A protein has these predicted regions:
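A general structural signal marking secondary-structure boundaries and capping sites
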Residues: 30, 57-61, 176
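Conserved GNAT-fold acetyl-CoA-binding loop/helix
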Residues: 31-55
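A short helix-loop-beta-strand connector motif used in the catalytic cores of GNAT acetyltransferases and
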Residues: 54-69
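Sparse recognition of residues in long alpha-helices and their boundaries
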Residues: 39-40, 66, 162, 188
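Acyl-donor (CoA/ACP) binding surface of acyl/acetyltransferases
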Residues: 1-20, 28, 71, 75-201
Length: 201
């Protein structure tokens, strides 16, 4: 399976049948069901979801949704998922969702690296215009990361009820031009190794 995009710490691939067992395990993880997927699928539903992801990803262009699996650059083990949703090929926009499913890699550089690698793929390979992201107000790590590079478009107050609390939903966006400015601003600091290795241009 070829790499869709490559970063320093991870690379992205379209999931294949070889990834089915891993995806099935993630779909049945209680933490991910509660925090990410928002559902508790039984085994058959989970199997159908995995099959749909693999079949949908066989189509290179034109799909409304694309699922990418992130793998560790050195260990070649699956560490997370990137989901591109509501893809508007005409207006060149989409929504991005990501998760570190492998518990051992939820800390460290993997989350930011997955997002950076995905944005490079979206803007430099697919030539999209704008990306939207959504973050709950209790996800401080993702909020900090979003505020670092993206613009907050608005807040959906008291959007969902979780563990006896109402959570707000923050909407962020970044367009291709702003991403270019972000890369240029940081090319001599924390992105210097990405540029040196030709991972970003």
């Amino acid at each position: 399976m070829f790499n869709v995009a490559t970063g320093l710490f991870c690379y992205l691939q379209r999931p294949s049948i070889e990834d089915a067992d891993t995806l099935l395990e993630w779909l049945q993880d209680p933490l991910l069901q509660d925090k990410v997927f928002g559902m508790e699928p039984d085994l058959q539903q989970a199997q159908e979801t995995v099959q749909h992801w693999i079949e949908e990803n066989a189509e290179l262009f034109g799909a409304e949704n694309i699922v990418l699996i992130a793998k560790h650059s050195k260990k070649d083990i699956p560490i997370g998922l990137v989901m591109l949703k509501n893809i508007d090929w005409r207006n060149r926009s989409l929504d991005i969702h990501y998760l570190i499913a492998n518990e051992a890699h939820r800390n460290g550089p993997y989350g930011p690296e997955m997002v950076l690698t995905t944005l490079v793929y979206i803007f430099q390979s697919l030539n999209f215009h704008k990306v939207y992201g959504y973050v709950y107000n209790n996800n401080l790590a993702s909020l900090n990361m979003a505020n670092f590079a993206a613009k907050e478009e608005g807040i959906l107050k008291n959007y969902t009820y979780v563990n006896n609390n109402w959570l707000d939903y923050h909407l962020y966006s970044i367009n291709q031009q702003d991403f270019k400015v972000f890369l240029d601003k940081n090319k001599n600091t924390f992105l210097r190794h990405h540029f040196k290795k030709g991972l970003i241009h």
